[in-house]
């Protein structure tokens, strides 16, 4: 780590530098930053795309689907100078936008029933994860608040009894008039996955999902062409060491008969649950649902 220090180097790919670089319109601060980077690299942006190209790209980006033939004809025939911005606003209001970007965010954050730490309700948990994000995308909740709801999520509150926690959660599983899961302030399943139990796994997942950075190499060694050292990784990993998600029982509840272990043992004995028999899992799930109602 101490012997190698990466130095960022920009190497232009053309002679379009300085005064030779053409004027490029940038209507927003983001565009200005992009153009500044392109100017440094000597890359001239592509020409403005055609209406047909724009409509196809914006539909795929925002809704994951292609425009209908009638929509294409109407858009191309329009003479309005604002038709592109209006089309973007229109697509952002479509249900397909919320569905498509919820799917993307679930993918980025690792929503996978097979990795959720509950063999009985993992499919329900994956669905609740999706619904929690979908509601926020649909109602235009800012991304920083969505990220906060995932990163700072809690399940059982400090000092909350298991009985009170179990009663509150059971309302989401009722057959009639269940409480929508998206009404919860936070979504705790991000930290409930089986593949993020260790602090280093949490660090890798967080860096990829929320920072867009892959730091696997720094976990073992200093990469000669990357800025992250193994020491950086260990410091970053330390942030995630206090985070835990497990069915632990506080000392005050041990022996009370009202904790996770004792309640699950009671239900398993009632249905004759055997982990080796798959059909027992369905009976166990049905019994838990029955008690929730």
Residue ranges of each PLM-predicted region?
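Short, structured secondary-structure elements
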Residues: 1, 7-274, 280-286, 293
């Amino acid at each position: 780590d101490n012997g190698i220090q990466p130095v960022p180097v920009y190497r232009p790919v053309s002679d379009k530098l300085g005064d030779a670089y053409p004027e490029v319109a940038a209507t927003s601060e983001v565009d200005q930053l992009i153009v500044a980077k392109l100017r440094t690299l000597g890359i001239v942006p592509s020409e403005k795309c055609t209406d047909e190209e724009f409509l196809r790209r914006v539909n795929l980006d925002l809704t994951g689907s292609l425009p209908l033939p009638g929509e294409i004809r109407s858009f191309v025939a329009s003479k309005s100078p604002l038709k592109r911005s209006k089309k973007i606003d229109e697509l952002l209001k479509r249900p397909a936008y919320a569905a498509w970007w919820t799917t993307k965010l679930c993918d980025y954050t690792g929503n996978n029933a097979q990795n959720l730490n509950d063999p009985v309700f993992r499919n329900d948990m994956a669905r609740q994860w999706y619904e929690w994000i979908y509601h926020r995308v649909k109602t235009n909740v800012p991304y920083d608040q969505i990220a906060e709801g995932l990163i700072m999520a809690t399940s059982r509150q400090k000092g909350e009894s298991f009985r009170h926690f179990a009663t509150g959660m059971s309302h989401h599983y009722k057959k009639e008039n269940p409480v929508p899961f998206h009404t919860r302030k936070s979504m705790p399943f991000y930290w409930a996955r089986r593949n993020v139990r260790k602090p280093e796994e949490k660090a890798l997942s967080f860096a990829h999902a929320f920072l867009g950075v892959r730091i696997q190499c720094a976990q073992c060694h200093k990469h000669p062409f990357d800025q992250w050292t193994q020491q950086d990784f260990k410091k970053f990993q330390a942030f995630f060491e206090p985070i835990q998600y497990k069915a632990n029982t506080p000392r005050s509840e041990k022996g009370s008969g009202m904790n996770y272990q004792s309640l699950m043992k009671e239900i398993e004995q009632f249905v004759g649950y055997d982990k080796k028999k798959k059909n027992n899992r369905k009976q166990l799930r049905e019994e838990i649902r029955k008690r929730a109602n």
